[in-house]
Amino acid sequence: VADWETKRAWLNYAYDEFLQAGYKISSAYTVVKDNSKVNFSYRDNLWQGSDLIATGIASFGHVSGVHYQNKADMKEYQSDLTEHGKLPLGRGYKPTRHQLLVREMILLLKRGYLDVDYFQNKFEVDITQQWSSQFQQHSEDGMLTIEGGRIQLTRKGFLNADALLPVFFEEEHQGIRYT
């Protein structure tokens, strides 16, 4: 298995090749040829807090303000569905409003940018004030820029998108490995 430095080098190479072929970076994980013809409805709606019913083993879902994960063991998952006639729910959690803000912010940051006014209007929070030191550090590290109410990932930021996120987690959620 390749180390992170190698994986980032591969991704950087892939970005260059796609950009030369006329594609644009759409998120830390996607490129598109023509933004006007491509709609990542699933991603964009989910990342902005819409409900999603999880249907696979160990899948995460979000319904009516509750986050949940299906069972991770295949036998238990199948048994719940076929023998017990119930959903294979493994665990669930009702996040606070602040946790919903954090969730939405970190997911949308993977898209490559954040509009500060969006969060002010939806959550009544100025994210540049709430996490000023975190954004400042990421800016100093060359991961993002902050201009005119917009936080924008740099290429370096896209290559390290997932590594940027934990500083925004609540303390009790940092350092946790999720299935």
Predicted regions and their residues:
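Short, amphipathic alpha-helical interaction segments positioned at domain boundaries
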Residues: F158-T179
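A short, conserved structural fragment
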Residues: S139-G149
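Minor-groove-contacting beta-hairpin "wing" of winged helix-turn-helix DNA-binding domains
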Residues: R150-T154
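C-terminal scaffold of the Radical SAM
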Residues: V1-V125, I176-T179
